[in-house]
Amino acid sequence: MTHLYAHIRRAGAALTLLVSLSSICSCDDGAIEEHHQPTQETNTYTLRFCANIKGVSSWNGQYSVALACFDSESEYAKTVKTLHDTDADEDRDTILLSGVGTDISTVEVAILSPLRRRIATIASFKISADISDSDTIVIDAGDIEADMFVSINRFVFQGNNCSRCHSGSSPASDLNLSADVAYSNILNIPSVKSPSTLRVKPGDADNSYLYRIITDENIGSHYAHTGLFTDAPQQAFIDIIKSWINAGAK
């Protein structure tokens, strides 16, 4: 009888342990499930971004083009997704981005620093402030040109007022930097100020007049072009231009 009672006690203890372990496993499974299914407390939603993106593969150096989410308070992206060129046999890419916070105000195809600071915005899409975490936001962005030189042309030659002096029938230093002719007027063309130096010498930024005039205050120009690059995003384009030239200026 004593032996039978001992067996019953051991069986009861084993059953209690089994129930306890089962409870632990159930809690773990529940936590994992909740982690992957956002609730009202997570304040996030899913973004579906559709676009035909070209030129991303032309980028080199420390700066890159990415799909980035920004709030209204900071120049640093809160969520980032790496981009690639849309394949030739595809109409457009579809990019899914989950866990996007409801504090995000814009979704951008942007040039970013290694620390995810916005250098320039290639395309921007405003997010409504009244979204809920159960929403899936769909953005059809159409065609986006993200080529490295196209960005230099847009944000430096045109956006930084270079073409104000370097355009028209009598451009400064006989250099027309209007958007449609800027590339052909700088590549392998001797500088008027320094005929022995090419404006852009592919593969050699240090010996390209374009790079030298924006980095050297003593180059001899009557206008200090270094003054065009004063804040951090503009200064970043000095490195971007250098990387573009050293990679072959394509």
Language model features: what each stretch is:
Residues 22-26:
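C-terminal motif of bacterial Sec signal peptides marking the signal peptidase cleavage site
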